[in-house]
UniProtKB/Swiss-Prot annotation:
It is found in: Virion. This is Capsid protein. The record marks Y90 as: RNA-binding. SUPFAM superfamilies: RNA bacteriophage capsid protein. InterPro entries: Levivir_coat, Phage_RNA-type_capsid. GO terms for biological process: regulation of translation. Its main location: virion. GO terms for cellular component: T=3 icosahedral viral capsid. Keywords: Capsid protein, RNA-binding, T=3 icosahedral capsid protein, Translation regulation, Virion. GO terms for molecular function: RNA binding; structural molecule activity. Disulfide bonds: none annotated. It comes from the Viruses. It comes from Qbeta virus (strain MX1). Belongs to the Leviviricetes capsid protein family.
Length: 133
């Protein structure tokens, strides 16, 4: 298992000119969910990423890797800001692998998702909320 450490996401945003620094916030000892967030004065307004890996159980035979992104927004279009969340954007990605999957198969799924998210059809669907036809 990798040690929880700071992550820098660069080249993000619509124009690719945003950098986000995520700092480790700890691992929940009960469920093993690792949390990272942007340093901020108001915790509710911090951008947050959580990562968890669930082991197979008697009833569930697959490993489950979940990555969740939460981006709260505190300002209105007019630029008026207050210390409360006006809305949040979320992403929830779940990967499922059998215990017999190889690291090559898992890497293929991860890189396929990366390439898929760079495709113009998905960019239009996510950024502009336009469905495929």
């Amino acid at each position: 298992m990798a040690k929880l450490q700071a992550i820098t996401l660069s080249g993000i945003g619509k124009n690719g000119d945003v950098t986000l620094n995520l700092n480790p916030r700890g691992v929940n000892p009960t469920n093993g969910v690792a949390a990272l967030s942007e340093a901020g004065a108001v915790p509710a307004l911090e951008k947050r990423v959580t990562i968890s890996v669930s082991q197979p159980s008697r009833n569930r035979k697959n490993y489950k890797v979940q990555v969740k992104i939460q981006n709260p927004t505190s300002c209105t279009a007019s630029g008026t800001c207050d210390p409360s969340v006006t809305r949040s954007a979320y992403a929830d990605v779940t990967f499922s692998f059998t215990q017999y999957s190889t690291d090559e198969e898992r890497a293929l799924v991860r890189t396929e998702l990366k390439a898929l998210l760079a495709d113009p059809m998905l960019i239009d669907a996510i950024d502009n909320l336009n469905p495929a036809y």
